[in-house]
């Protein structure tokens, strides 16, 4: 904006069912957490109805199933977040003249995938504690449901080319499990409020720093 003015920005929107440009990105970022929350709430209601008469031994099966849903969520996370990083690096390489097409070099893809993996493992524990413990008390079944909802929304977003925030989707999915269990009062809404504040301030802060 500062360099070339608003007319040089591709604002976009929704074209052929896909979010494009700045407005499309903002729409995807706004809608994806809502879908995560609704998906988790509906899944929780469905699972509770199906397992109403299940034995308590189902806990072991649920925990084992989380190996699959955790892997699915990790894949969905990488499929979306790594693409965003690759896009930025490719844009820089194009501007520098290092490459001449939008096809990303393999070394860029590997470097970005490695960076996302290392960053998640090394620097994500504070966020993990907030999502896993501070929003609402989670049971194994809640974890399974929230992972399923989060992975589904994240992967669907990647398929349609929508850049979203996996952490936002996971946070809202965790809230959705609390709502689906009929325990909205037990959701720590002050923590949710702080997360929402971070969401709202992150984008303008990043834009100001870039400017």
Predicted regions and their residues:
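Multi-pass alpha-helical transmembrane bundle typical of ion/small-solute transporters
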Residues: 1-211
């Amino acid at each position: 904006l500062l360099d070339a003015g608003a007319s040089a920005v591709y604002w976009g929107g929704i074209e052929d069912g896909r979010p494009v440009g700045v407005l499309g990105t903002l729409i995807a970022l706004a809608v994806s957490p809502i879908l995560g929350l609704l998906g988790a709430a509906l899944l929780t209601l469905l699972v509770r109805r199906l397992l109403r008469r299940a034995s308590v031994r189902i806990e072991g099966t649920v925990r084992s199933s989380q190996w699959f849903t955790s892997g699915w969520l990790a894949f969905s996370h990488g499929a979306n977040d790594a693409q965003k990083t690759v896009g930025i690096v490719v844009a820089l390489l194009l501007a520098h003249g290092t490459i001449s097409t939008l096809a990303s070099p393999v070394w860029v893809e590997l470097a970005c995938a490695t960076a996302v993996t290392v960053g998640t493992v090394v620097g994500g524990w504070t966020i993990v504690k907030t999502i896993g413990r501070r929003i609402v008390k989670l049971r194994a079944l809640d974890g399974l449901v929230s992972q399923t909802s989060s992975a589904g929304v994240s992967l669907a977003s990647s398929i349609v080319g929508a850049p979203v925030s996996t952490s936002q989707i996971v946070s809202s999915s965790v809230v959705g499990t609390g709502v689906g269990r009929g325990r909205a009062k037990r959701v720590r809404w002050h923590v949710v409020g702080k997360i929402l504040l971070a969401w709202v301030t992150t984008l303008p802060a990043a834009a100001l720093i870039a400017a």
